[in-house]
Amino acid sequence: MHFSTITAALALLGLGAATPTDYSTSSYSKNQGLAQAWTSKGRQYIGTALTIRDDPVEQGIIQSRTDFNSITPENAMKWESTEPQRNNFTFAGADAVADFADRYNKEMRCHTLVWHSQLPAWVSQGNFDNKTLISIMENHIKKVAGRYKNKCTHWDVVNEALNEDGTYRSSVFYNTIGEAFIPIAFRFAEKYAGSKTKLYYNDYNLEYGSAKALGAQRILKLVQSYGVQIDGVGLQAHLSSEATASTGGGVTPDVQTLTNVLKLYTDLGVEVAYTELDVRFTTPATDAKLKAQADAYARVVQSCINVKRCVGITVWGVSDKYSWIPGVFPTEGAALLWDENFNKKPAYSSVLKTIQSFRKS
């Protein structure tokens, strides 16, 4: 997840929302859910972020395989949750997610091993030298990835290592180890995560084809140059359907731009996925805003359809009731496929219709 705005450079792309489409209920089959439709076309998963809580409606939607056959732990596997003190591991939350995946027959996208945020102070402020920090990183990856060896279909190994201009973000890992921290992390993940697990680099604001997207391509080439396993690039896709206070004027790109960005990575031999998708706007919702949002969701889905190695799409939650966005951007939200009362929105219909409309290749 990210809390950054889209840079002014995105305006140079001249991207705007396409004319909203009327996704009438007569134009698609309501007898399928999202995951059912997606897997019937030969693709791997439609997923959602999971926080286990006492809400039987939300949890019931996630438990069913109709709409979601994959889950991503929203916070339970992050460093501050799993190793809050050095070599003192706490797995209750992460184990609960893994048990949920087993019980309800879900794929599990595990998130995330090395990230500058939600990192305990003992790591970020420890003043460790290069050798010690690498040892700490290996121990963390060994214990966390090793605990869920081959249970995770994917691991976001390194998360958000880039600035908006494509340069490396200042972090304890980069400042101490240099760019080599990235292939080193992937080497440890390759060693401990299990041969069945796909290893990903994950970041936000890649979708616009800007310098940051090229930075992620550079990371991919870097890891490959070390001869280390890297299987995919995750595009978080925290997007908007209109210009908002937080986006600096950018909106969800057109299908061709999105498709071209995905191909930046698949042309280098890896797969891609949208990993944290939501599409916000300035609230309150209106019919026009909901239609524009539906069209934006459809563009994202269509771009994934266009690229055979785009294996899946994860939305960052089920209902607007629990979305992270209003807590960070108070005038924005309504970004998910179900509203706060768990009614399916036009965006749900647009995603389902778009999936059902493409022919399996």
Swiss-Prot record:
Biological pathway: Glycan degradation; xylan degradation
Activity vs pH: Optimum pH is 6.0.
Pfam families: Glyco_hydro_10
Signal peptide positions (record): 1-26
Disulfide bonds: 304-310
One BP annotation, GO: xylan catabolic process
Gene3D superfamilies: Glycosidases (3.20.20.80)
GO MF, one example: endo-1,4-beta-xylanase activity
Temperature dependence: Optimum temperature is 70 degrees Celsius.
Chief location bin: secreted
Role played: Endo-1,4-beta-xylanase involved in the hydrolysis of xylan, a major structural heterogeneous polysaccharide found in plant biomass representing the second most abundant polysaccharide in the biosphere, after cellulose. Hydrolyzes birch-wood xylan, with a similar activity toward oat-spelt xylan. Also shows weak activities toward pNP-beta-D-cellobioside and pNP-beta-D-xylopyranoside, but no detectable activity toward carboxymethyl cellulose and pNP-beta-L-arabinofuranoside.-.
Name listed for the protein in its UniProt record: Endo-1,4-beta-xylanase 2
